[in-house]
Amino acid sequence: RLLSSAISVYGEPKLASANIDDKTLKYSEKLSTIDNKNYHLITNLDQIDKWINEAEEVGEVAVDTETTSLDPHQADLVGISLCSKIGKACYIPVGHRSSKSIDKDKVIKKLKKLLEDSSVKKIGQNIKFDFIVFFKHGITLSSMEDTMLMSYVLDAGKNRHNMDTLSDIHL
């Protein structure tokens, strides 16, 4: 009955056009070629050492936190992502309900030296959020670069500076 009422008001539903613009087609082709073998779920504390060593060797690491809230002051830490080389990254679950989650305090203790090391650049999107989340856990991030702020400084009024927009523009 609800469907017939909707049809009487709005008419028969029409399928979207199958025409795909070039930008969407190129993007989907690029996605289909992504090799996921170098994206790792960290399942034990010892695996983190390899990622710390790599970040120290390279001198920079992209870092991102996953949390339970968009408010960093109220957010609980759920996971941490690290990436020092293109096409290679890891995710460390610390607040998941599954058995794959690693003890948060032990992970924080292990990552503290790296994240506070001023000789290793930490790169993030809206990294001030991550700064607050880590600070709540006793880590003071140092030597940070924020892609959101970089975008704003370079093109303040040109675009939005969120990750989706920046990905569309630069990737």
Residues of each region from the PLM?
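Long, highly charged low-complexity segments
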Residues: 1-80, 94-114
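Active-site-proximal helix-loop-helix substrate-binding element of RNase H-like nuclease domains
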Residues: 37, 71, 75-171
